[in-house]
């Protein structure tokens, strides 16, 4: 029996290698997927083999994650509950797909992951695996073994599994698009998040940053005039924007599994690019298009967060989003100061803005007769209804 395990290199999945091997008398094959996290994958591979992995795979999926997931998040202004740019939620389907590919290659239908029974990730992993692999048999050790962190450490020591035993206050998950932070005082929503929880947005530069981002059909392609591939562009903004303290999210989040959770994220590039993209949309779209697009964005964000990446409606929403984004091209100028970002200018060949029409100093003015006629017709529904109801 072979079991393919989605392996992060952390305590849970390291213990899972040995636990799966002992519990199911199985050959465990570990798979690590690089979606831009700042990990030492050589050490992760060594740790997997020391824990008992029969074979280890490392899959480089950074470019695919950037192009097929992060860029979609920009085009759809993907912010769950209007604040969270979905970094973890976007990565899980791709990781599951890569793990499923290894399972097919190894000729097994048994796949394992390290998600717990109270997290969102179990939903995302399970649904993605069920989509990617026919007749998949999913094993989630953390949903079965009921071990605490201390139990896991003791289990590892008893079996000679080398692990880092020093206690970390925070549980971290990161990829190219963002970093999530959990644990310790963060669990108390009344307490301020300590500065030592932040890494990407720890203030390292005090100077004001001005930069421009150019979009083509809703996709960022240049920063300060330099054409960059998506991975480099996102990485650059994570550093330049994050080093000035911008990119933090803290809120009470409504989880898929039925309760509220205090969540803290860092996503400098994601938040900067979505802010710029939304501003450019506002520059080129009609009021009705904007209203419609905001509805698309909200629904798309909910589907992704809730693990419904393979829901057919997502494709429909993206088709509509792509049609609208055909006109979202231009340049947005940003200013990043200490822990803040604002749009300071924008241009687009598709902007209907006319200074001749909008300026109060010169140009077009409706006549008194035109203004009176417009106002009379514009307010007629309200005026007639109010008169009918209240006299």
From Swiss-Prot:
Superkingdom of this protein's organism: Archaea
Enzyme type, top EC level: ligase
Keywords for this protein: Amino-acid biosynthesis, Arginine biosynthesis, ATP-binding, Cytoplasm, Ligase, Nucleotide-binding
InterPro entries linked: Arginosuc_syn_C, Arginosuc_syn_N, Arginosuc_synth, Arginosuc_synth_CS, Arginosuc_synth_type_1_subfam, AS_cat/multimer_dom_body, Rossmann-like_a/b/a_fold
Positions that bind L-citrulline: 84, 120, 124, 171, 180, 253, 265
Cross-referenced Gene3D superfamilies: Argininosuccinate synthetase, chain A, domain 2 (3.90.1260.10), HUPs (3.40.50.620)
GO molecular function: argininosuccinate synthase activity; ATP binding
Pathway: Amino-acid biosynthesis; L-arginine biosynthesis; L-arginine from L-ornithine and carbamoyl phosphate: step 2/3
Localization, UniProt: Cytoplasm
Oligomer status and interactors: Homotetramer.
Protein family per UniProt: Belongs to the argininosuccinate synthase family. Type 1 subfamily.
Name this protein carries in UniProt: Argininosuccinate synthase
Organism whose genome encodes this protein: Metallosphaera sedula (strain ATCC 51363 / DSM 5348 / JCM 9185 / NBRC 15509 / TH2)
Name of the encoding gene: argG
């Amino acid at each position: 029996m072979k079991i393919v395990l989605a392996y992060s290199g952390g305590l849970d999945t390291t213990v899972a290698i040995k636990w799966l091997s002992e519990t199911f008398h199985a050959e465990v094959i570990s798979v690590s997927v690089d979606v831009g996290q700042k990990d030492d994958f050589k050490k992760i591979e060594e740790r997997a083999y020391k824990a008992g992995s029969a074979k280890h795979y490392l899959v480089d999926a950074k470019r695919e994650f950037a192009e097929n997931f992060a860029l979609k998040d920009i085009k759809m202004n993907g912010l769950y509950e209007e604040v969270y740019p979905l970094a973890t939620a976007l990565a899980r389907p791709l990781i599951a797909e890569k793990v499923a590919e290894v399972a097919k290659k190894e000729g097994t239908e048994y796949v394992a992951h390290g998600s717990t029974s109270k997290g969102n990730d179990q939903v995302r992993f399970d649904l993605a695996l069920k989509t990617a692999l026919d007749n998949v048999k999913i094993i989630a050790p953390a949903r079965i073994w009921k071990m605490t962190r201390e139990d896991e450490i003791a289990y590892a020591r008893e079996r000679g599994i080398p692990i880092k035993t020093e206690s970390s206050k925070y549980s971290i998950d990161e990829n190219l698009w963002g970093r999530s932070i959990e644990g310790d005082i963060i669990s108390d929503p009344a307490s301020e998040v300590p500065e030592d929880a932040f890494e990407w947005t720890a203030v390292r530069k005090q100077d004001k940053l001005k930069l421009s981002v150019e979009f083509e059909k809703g996709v960022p392609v240049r920063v300060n005039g330099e054409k960059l591939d998506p991975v480099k562009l996102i990485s650059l903004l994570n550093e330049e924007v994050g080093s000035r303290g911008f990119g933090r999210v803290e809120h009470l989040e409504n989880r898929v599994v039925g309760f509220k959770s205090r969540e803290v994220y860092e996503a400098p590039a994601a938040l900067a690019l979505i802010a710029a993209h939304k501003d450019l949309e506002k520059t080129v779209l009609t009021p009705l298009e904007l209203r419609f697009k905001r509805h698309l964005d909200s629904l798309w964000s909910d589907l992704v967060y809730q693990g419904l990446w393979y829901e057919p409606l997502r494709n429909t929403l993206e088709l509509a989003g792509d049609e609208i984004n055909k006109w979202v091209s231009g340049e947005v100028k940003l200013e990043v100061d200490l822990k803040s970002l604002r749009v300071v200018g924008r241009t687009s060949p598709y902007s209907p803005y006319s200074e001749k029409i909008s300026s109060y100093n010169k140009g077009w003015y409706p006549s008194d007769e035109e203004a009176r006629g417009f106002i009379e017709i514009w307010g007629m529904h309200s005026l007639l209804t109010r008169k009918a109801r209240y006299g």
